[in-house]
Design a protein with these regions (language model features):
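Short, small-residue-biased leader/transition segments that mark boundaries at the very start
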Residues: 3-8
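Hydrophobic alpha-helical interaction segments
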Residues: 12-51
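Short, composition-biased local secondary-structure segments
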Residues: 44-60, 108-113, 133-144
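Acidic-basic catalytic patches of nuclease active cores, encompassing PD-(D/E)XK
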Residues: 57-105
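Conserved catalytic cores of phosphodiester-cleaving nucleases, focusing on short active-site segments
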Residues: 88, 109-136, 143-145, 155
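A short acidic, amphipathic alpha-helical/loop segment
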Residues: 141-146, 166-170
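Domain-level recognition of nuclease-like catalytic cores that cleave nucleotide substrates
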Residues: 160-212
Length: 212
């Protein structure tokens, strides 16, 4: 346990603005790995007494297992948003989270902010919408109508690979995937050059905002 704590401490000391902005893909994956280690340690501490006590029947076991799984899913989704938010702040990007758009939709990230989105004199070409989902599957469609002013939606995901048919459908619907750079190799070769690594996405946003 002490060795694990020292390892986590050493990683934390190496974090600075330069390393985050120059290698956001690498930093994000390192944060996710470290957070998962901490969360597993927390889970063991929290659940061990219950597991040692046991369960009276199958239904109790299933119910308790579902609680654990739901907590894991909730943590993973929220932590991804928080990690991305931290990276965007270090990279000096202007953005706002949970902006209320049409029909009370709330995209995860709007660049540069909600006021610009709702100002119809602000050029739509300078607006960017980014959704963040740990996995895509069929959930990617949720972002399609979250920001009507922005025709091309960006979607960040940690999913390692999506079927060729689903990728084709995504790009027909003007969804541009953003994934950690090391994960691009898991996608069909014919789509790899269309997928943005995180460092390219932050550079893309920065270039637009430098023109404002």
């Amino acid at each position: 346990r002490r060795q694990r704590q020292m390892c986590i401490r050493d990683r934390a000391h190496k974090i600075n603005k330069n390393t985050i902005c120059s290698e956001p893909d690498k930093q994000l994956l390192a944060w996710i790995d470290t957070e998962y280690e901490l969360f597993r340690a927390f889970e063991a501490k929290l659940y061990d007494p219950v597991l040692k006590t046991g369960f009276s029947d199958i239904e109790s076991l299933i119910s308790y297992s579902n609680q654990i799984l739901n907590r894991r899913k909730s943590r993973a989704g929220k932590s991804l948003e928080h990690h991305l938010e931290t990276i965007f702040k270090f990279c000096d990007l202007k953005f706002e989270t949970q902006v209320i758009t049409e029909e009370h939709k709330k995209p995860d990230f709007i660049f540069p902010d909600g006021a610009s989105y709702h100002n119809f004199e602000f050029p739509a070409d300078d607006l960017i919408c980014l959704g963040a989902k740990t996995t895509c599957k069929d959930r990617w469609r949720q972002i399609l109508n979250e920001a009507d002013r922005i025709p091309v939606k960006h979607l960040f995901t940690l999913q390692q690979g999506v079927s060729k048919n689903q990728l084709a459908e995504m790009y027909r619907e003007k969804v541009c995937l953003v994934v950690p750079k090391p994960y691009i190799r898991y996608f069909d070769e014919s789509f790899q050059d269309k997928i943005m690594p995180l460092n390219v996405f932050t550079g893309f946003v920065k270039a637009k905002q430098n023109r404002l």
